[in-house]
Amino acid sequence: MPPRLIPPDPHFAGSRAGAAGERAVWRALRDTLPDDAALLADLGVLEGAREHEIDVLVVWPGVGLGVIEVKSGPIERRDGAWYQGRPPNAHRIDPVRQSQDARHALTRWLAANGAPDAGRARAAHLVAFPHTDVPRDWHAPEAPRGVVLGRGDLADAAAHVRRAIEDHGGGHAPLTSTDADVVVALLDAPLPSHTELLAAAA
């Protein structure tokens, strides 16, 4: 059985290349995560006027939370900076900071909205480059190899995410099954239909 999928068949927005990359990472995790985990796509966390986007989120009981920023197309890191695209059209990006900021925003939001233990559970931020080969021995100060998911890692994506959470995740303890359910319920945030509201009031 696959993990819980929210939504079951996500519609990834953005450019064709960007959507294809996010879909590739989502499918890789869908196919490798255990059935007690949950896989969420395209989440937004609004803090005041600042919006954080989470491309893919793994909620894994007994392990923790994995916040993944996906960057499609060719990715390079040179002169201490990240670039997406091919010269002369490459543009500068900061995927590690994006993912890190989103992780902090998510854990703060969880702690403030009824899941304080989940907000303190182990959580890691990762970056995924599904169209870029990343050598096994590569690493950068802000991005050890364990938090970088390259094209060659997709076949074993869940194991890579698990190692990232266990080796590099902040927090105090693994995520319990109960807290995982709370996280999924809070993030899914179903809005009752008019019929359901009438039935509940009857």
Q: Over which residues does each language-model region extend?
A:
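Intrinsically disordered, low-complexity Ser/Thr/Pro/Gly-rich regulatory segments
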Residues: 1-202
